[in-house]
Amino acid sequence: RPPRSTLFPYTTLFRSRKGRVGSVMSITDPNIFNEVQRIAVEDSRLGIPLINARDVIHGFKTIFPIPLGQAASFNPEIAETGARIAATEASAAGIRWTFAPMIDITHDPRWGRIAEGFGEDPLLVSQMGVAAIKGFQGSSLNHPTSIAACAKHFAGYGASEGGRDYNSTYITERQFRNLYLRPFEAAVNAGAATLMTAFNDNDGIPSSANPFLLKDVLRNEWNYRGTVVSDWASVSEMIRHGFCEDEKEAALKATNAGTDIEMVSETYIKHLPQLIKEGKVSMETIDNAVRNILRL
């Protein structure tokens, strides 16, 4: 076996051994991932295995039409078949979690990510999204060719003002319920293993710290028991939104709102221990987040 330092950055291996890594992204060489996984399972204190995630959007080795093109067929079977093939190929490379499907309702063609979704109609987006989830996850996530799906971006990301990515949105509750939330409710009912929060803020509140979306609707109304992950550094990005003063406040607000996993940025690992000591984040909140993650 090659020296560990040549397989993966030493710092990541060290942190994995210390139990400070919960997931990794975009490792497509099974030999590399197996080494990181071995360390997590055999050498860390709790022995909790890692999950390897990647953007498997419209194919892995075999590339299919973009989701917007698939939606133009008005045939959900296309989305399900493509996702099933992609899951089979990705799982063979050690990937067990994809950040797809994107089920944002999109109306503005200026938005750069419009091609990643299924369009503007909530019924069609719901049906195509559910089909993709079924294709990725198969009959059971325990099957070796199944990977966890991630319905994204919760919610309203496609309504970014002026079509500018990461921009603010101004969506009323009626618009949310009649339009933007419909595909996500369908995804929850279809058993989507994970949901990803959106980059945008709505009326000044970023999605990663929005208790109306993450608690009132997702957990209390829809009884969702899956995992909620932030988008890439969207927790720390709340500082740029002007919603949080610093990383500590970002960790506080995102955790208490119901974001279980912070992607890429490290406000949780830096500040949650102190926030717990100060009584600003309860152990019940931490335990609930851990349960949601371990179920995945």
Labelled PLM ranges:
Residues R1, P9-L296:
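Glycoside hydrolase catalytic-domain context in secreted enzymes
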